[in-house]
Amino acid sequence: MSNMVLNGNIDKSDRNSILDILQSLENIAWGQPGSARCDFRSDVITRPSLRMLSAVLKTTLGDDVFREDLTTAHFEAHVAEISGREEGMFVITGTMANQLCLHALVSTRPCGILLSSESHAIHYEAGGSSMLSGAMLQPVQPSNGKYLRVEDLEEHAILTDDVHKCPTSIVSMENTAGGAVVPVHELRRIRDWAKQNNVRTHLDGARLFEAVATGAGTLKEYCSLIDLVSVDFSKNLGAPMGAMILGDKKLIQQMRRTRKGIGGGMRQGGVITAAAREALFENFGLGAEIESQTLLQVHKVAKRLGEEWTRKGGKLSKEIETNIIWLDLDAVGIKKSQFIDKGREYGVILDGCRIVCHHQIDIYAVEALIDVFHDILKADPIKNKNSDR
């Protein structure tokens, strides 16, 4: 048996030989962006690369429920190490990661979870917190319009002994939050506030790699400040699926049982984790700080599109910090449906005012979207508004 199979890693010669074979095959979807090349709806639509398929073909096939899959175990240990945490646990989706984290942090009932009113856990996780944790969500509009700060927690957290109230026991944050980078110093303030008030913390880091790419902080700096952190490999990193929870050993052990209880245990987990590992290495790097230029190039594309929109007379709802652009369609009298239809005319897939860039968007799609901006904005905004009445 080769060393590669024993340790769950792929050496360069093995990888290149498999890639040569894969590249000679016809009608293979892996490594082909397909419709993702012109899809600005989200970065979840990225397609896995041939290198990821190569990693899958060379993975170990142990049983992860029995903790016998080396590829999975080594990947969990690697991500935990570069994040500065005791242990990591791989799960199939970011939603599962978030919900397992929140469930693990519920120590008493009733339990209130304070989070941004725009958070993924509120709008896009099928009410998982009520089903799995029996917790009450306490949504708060961030006062800076971007992300939660200590001032928001001080104003809205319920820390009273009043028996009429559901006490705030957990604070859940996102980074990035709608594309905005949460500074390390702000998370440090929240950590200190939470400790003083006996509140647990969770970070939805589905796009944490985007924040690290900006130079705002390393994985270790961010992950060291929060009780439980979840990171995603299937967005701009391009893995077919997968996320990881990072925290202390005791909590992770507890969550392994809960993961099994909700059907998240994986048998031959290496088939999934090998691709996720390769996605991390390809599009981020091996360490706690970014090594690949992939994400930074995507940020440049996002900023260019934002500049084109404003140069043609459009307005932005939020500053562009990473890979997400928020267009103010109302300011130019454009309905969401009109914008989507116009994109379809030019061959790009849109979903309203949020434009999400990723590494598989090609230059032709970028130019086509700029043409959409021009077509939309060349009309008189007042006329557009009147036509909607």
From Swiss-Prot:
Repressor among keywords? no
* Gene Ontology terms describing biological process: glycine biosynthetic process; threonine catabolic process; toxin biosynthetic process
GO CC terms of this entry: cytosol
| Pfam families recorded | Beta_elim_lyase
Task: Spell out the molecular function terms from Gene Ontology.
Answer: alanine racemase activity; L-allo-threonine aldolase activity
The alphabetical list of record keywords is: Isomerase, Pyridoxal phosphate
**Cofactor(s) it depends on:** pyridoxal 5'-phosphate
- EC number(s) in its UniProt entry? 5.1.1.1
Q: Which CDD domains match?
A: TA_like
The catalytic activity, as recorded, is:
L-alanine = D-alanine
Q: What happens when the gene is disrupted?
A: Reduces pathogenicity of the fungus on maize.
Q: Which residues carry this modification: N6-(pyridoxal phosphate)lysine?
A: 235
Pathway involvement?
Mycotoxin biosynthesis; HC-toxin biosynthesis
From the record, give the transmembrane residue ranges: none
Q: Which domain of life is it from?
A: Eukaryota
Q: Record's family?
A: Belongs to the threonine aldolase family.
Function, in words: Alanine racemase, part of the diffuse TOX2 gene cluster that mediates the biosynthesis of the HC-toxin, cyclic tetrapeptide of structure cyclo(D-Pro-L-Ala-D-Ala-L-Aeo), where Aeo stands for 2-amino-9,10-epoxi-8-oxodecanoic acid. HC-toxin is a determinant of specificity and virulence in the interaction between the producing fungus and its host, maize. TOXG catalyzes the conversion of L-alanine into D-alanine, an essential precursor for the production of the major forms of HC-toxin by the non-ribosomal peptide synthetase HTS1.
Q: What else is known?
A: The genes involved in HC-toxin biosynthesis, called collectively TOX2, are organized into a diffuse cluster that spans >500 kb. All of the known genes are duplicated or triplicated within this region, with some variation in copy number and chromosomal location among different race 1 strains.
| Annotated PANTHER family | L-THREONINE ALDOLASE (PTHR48097:SF9), L-THREONINE ALDOLASE-RELATED (PTHR48097)
- Name it: Alanine racemase TOXG
Which organism was this protein described from?
A: Cochliobolus carbonum
Q: What is the lineage of its organism?
A: Eukaryota, Fungi, Dikarya, Ascomycota, Pezizomycotina
